[in-house]
UniProtKB/Swiss-Prot annotation:
One of its GO terms (molecular function) is transferase activity. This is Carnitine operon protein CaiE. GO terms for biological process: carnitine metabolic process. NCBIfam families: PRK13627.1. The gene is caiE. It comes from Salmonella choleraesuis (strain SC-B67). Residues 180-198 have a biased composition (Basic and acidic residues). CDD domains: LbH_paaY_like. Overproduction of CaiE stimulates the activity of CaiB and CaiD.
Amino acid sequence: MSYYAFEGLIPVVHPDAFVHPSAVLIGDVIVGAGVYIGPLASLRGDYGRQILEAGSNLQDGCIMHGYCDTDTIVHENGHIGHGAILHGCVVGRDALVGMNSVIMDGAVIGEESIVAAMSFVKAGFQGEARQLLVGSPARVLRQVTDQELHWKRLNTKEYQDLAIRCRTGLSETKPLTQVEENRPRLKGTTDVKPKSAQ
């Protein structure tokens, strides 16, 4: 893991969290229990504080940063998709930020909300609970349905379980030179499917 102290502040990581070895945590970073941090994620606590609360996930290539005297927060069970950027914002409890979305300074994503992939949430946006945000700039399309929230929670559960699985089942290795016979497939822990397959 790449952990760096910055001007005396050292990242804090709960022992039940999983941080991929290629992720970088700098300075004022606080990571809660059961959190999953994916490959190449960057949490730069060299200005503002970066907080991932219990059960949340920050996937591959995500960035968290913010100005001095600000907190960038992903609340409990928050779900941050591949390549998303969070800058000085707050993501509410049980909310999802889709892949390659950008959430700007002072924005608040309401609890149980979903930000669609590739969306841009402008600075200062003040969201409410269970909003579906879409587009660039993002607008409120409608309320999140019970089915969509259930789908989100299954995905988050997969990442909470993945944090546990990675702590024991992930190891650096050398590649094989050919595919072995009867190569097995990996299984998740829920019955979640891509939205297009539902």
